[in-house]
């Protein structure tokens, strides 16, 4: 009991007496003035809302002033790209057209152009000069773009690229050209190889250079870095090369195109396709107006075959000296007569020939017997 009584006599640190002493230390007036502590509303609401609430009630309620929504900025200007480039010929105001040097169909040629088919035949990674003709000089900063597309409609939306084998075989000689690009420019360090950000098509662009003194055209040397028969690449699908003349903003000033086949023997393939073209009797594609592509003269092989004349039924007498020669010619004649009779071309004539042949054969045998009898009589004498 004594211990508990002693504990009650000890004042706790925050007992009632201690609190009363602390309360007396506070000032008598303005205990909760705004100078000592901020208002509760100010602690919970932003300053703009508090000022709006403190305004006179007679004024119409207004929302706090906020900045007006700004219009969205213009979209970045991307160059306009068509998903399927047009191969249609468009000379434009500058009379843009293409030309090719005259080339034969020998086995040794590395490239050859067929005006009849409007088609270029070339070997892998061989230089193919293409002439650019204009009727008037284009504006400064004009460029020339080359792009490959598939010719058939079922493949035209696909991107023409090299096969995986040739893409892996790229070496340091490729220079700035990416390994997947099919068309490359030779001898021009200012060539740019581009991938369209919308269609992912490959193209190569070079600045347009005016013709040199004494020349009427500009020449660009192109290379094709994959065969048309490569699996995983073109895979025997025909392609077109589109050459466009463009200004600095990408607007097309002129356009032209031609078909391309990359093969091992350009001369042989050109001869074969031209012969098949004549056999089919397809109309010759008209070259673009003002083009320097010369069409081949029409071949005589396309004319209809002439009908064979009927056999002549007239008989002729041929005098032959010597029996051996006579027998030889007689056997030859009999063989020809038998051939005509078996072919059935002249049924009436063959019968007449056969009957005449039998009569002549009978006469020859009788004469032969008479000669034999005479010889035997001389021997017996």
UniProtKB/Swiss-Prot annotation:
Protein name per its UniProtKB record: Cellular tumor antigen p53
Region (Oligomerization): 313-344
GO molecular function, one term: promoter-specific chromatin binding
Compositional bias ranges of the Basic and acidic residues kind: 270-283
Chain spans, region Interaction with USP7: 347-351
Region annotated Interaction with CCAR2, chain positions: 1-308
Residues recorded with modification Symmetric dimethylarginine: 323, 325
Region (Required for interaction with ZNF385A): 87-288
CDD domains on file: P53 (cd08367)
Sequence motif Bipartite nuclear localization signal, location on chain: 293-309
Modifications made to the protein after synthesis: Phosphorylation on Ser residues mediates transcriptional activation. Phosphorylated on Thr-18 by VRK1, which may prevent the interaction with MDM2. Phosphorylated on Ser-20 by CHEK2 in response to DNA damage, which prevents ubiquitination by MDM2. Phosphorylated on Ser-20 by PLK3 in response to reactive oxygen species (ROS), promoting p53/TP53-mediated apoptosis. Phosphorylated on Ser-33 by CDK7 in a CAK complex in response to DNA damage. Phosphorylated by HIPK1. Monomethylated at Lys-360 by SETD7, leading to stabilization and increased transcriptional activation. Monomethylated at Lys-358 by SMYD2, leading to decreased DNA-binding activity and subsequent transcriptional regulation activity. Lys-360 monomethylation prevents interaction with SMYD2 and subsequent monomethylation at Lys-358. Dimethylated at Lys-361 by EHMT1 and EHMT2. Monomethylated at Lys-370 by KMT5A, promoting interaction with L3MBTL1 and leading to repress transcriptional activity.
Biological processes per GO annotation: cellular senescence; circadian behavior; DNA damage response; entrainment of circadian clock by photoperiod; negative regulation of cell growth; negative regulation of DNA-templated transcription; nucleotide-excision repair; oligodendrocyte apoptotic process
Region (Interaction with E4F1): 244-282
Organism per entry: Canis lupus familiaris
Modified sites of kind N6-methyllysine: 358, 360, 370
Tagged with keyword DNA repair: no
Entry's localization field: Cytoplasm; Nucleus; Nucleus, PML body; Endoplasmic reticulum
Modified positions (Phosphothreonine) in chain numbering: 18, 272
Residue ranges of the region described as Interaction with WWOX: 63-97
Location of the region described as Interaction with HIPK1 in the Swiss-Prot/TrEMBL record: 87-358
